[in-house]
Amino acid sequence: LGLVVVDEQHRFGVEQRDGLRGPHGELPHRLVMTATPIPRTVAMTVFGDLDVSVLDQLPAGRQKISTHVVPLAEKPGWASRLWSRAREEIDAGHQVYVVVPKIGDVGDDTEEGVQLFGDGGREGAKSSDGKIRLTSVTAMNAYLQDVPALSGVRIGTLHGRMDAAEKTRVMTAFERAEIDLLISTTVIEVGVNVPNATLMIIMDADRFGISGLHQLRGRVGRGGAAGTCLLVTRQEADGISRERLDAVAGTTDGFELSRIDLQQRRRYSGGRAVGT
């Protein structure tokens, strides 16, 4: 083996890269690519004898992506505007992703689960133990079925517990514009290309890391129309979570986001760049 080309470099771990060694420990030439550098990538660049080439232009045919933080703790009334905004995109002939951090638990499709979104703010989102309940595919699907602004909209769901055939069926339907709004977990993060999708709404965006958010929003704006990503959070304005969201909203430069990520780890995690 003489040359290895690795796309989505940030998706591979140390052991997977170590598996490329030859029988006598020799390494092939490597070309690694990523649009989403992570602190481990920075460490490899500094200490791993990598030469760096930066492409700072959008690929041909891609449009800019605008990203905005939607702070429901301060602006609970903005919750209803999310779905009006989604309807505007759908009426314009486009499609929408709604990304959530979990698949669902027993009861998420009941009235109790739907109350998760009742007033858009923190109080309607708390469970019996006082913690904010994370948005799930199950609860979001149940909720959106009754949102007046989305009346008549074809809604689909996608998550990792579905078998491969069912996931393929759903994604094919979305690619063919047979689904207008797709509720999904992060299974769409890599390898999904639907040029007609122009809006992504990420619920509980504070539960995702910088690189994950940057990777997710790259699913929109892949065609002739500009993309928009809305980072929805119920966390208060102060704290590292909101700082992270503001950073993602402030730039689409993956290397700058990696620098910010590393800086935050230095401040809040004792400088750990690659976890434990």
Question: What residues fall within each predicted segment?
Answer:
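Conserved ATPase-coupling elements of RecA-like P-loop NTPase cores
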Residues: 1, 9-24, 109-110, 167, ...
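A short beta-strand-to-loop transition that corresponds to the Sensor-1 phosphate-sensing loop
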Residues: 9, 33-38, 46-50, 58, ...
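C-terminal helicase module of SF1/SF2 nucleic-acid helicases/translocases
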Residues: 74-95, 102, 118, 122-123, ...
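Pocket-edge structural micro-motifs
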Residues: 46, 56-57, 69, 100, ...
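Post-DEXD/H (motif II) to motif III coupling segment of the RecA-like Helicase ATP-binding lobe
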Residues: 2-68, 74-91, 95
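Conserved P-loop NTPase catalytic core
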Residues: 55-62, 67-72, 106-131
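Flexible, glycine-rich phosphate/dinucleotide-binding loops
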Residues: 39, 61, 105, 164, ...
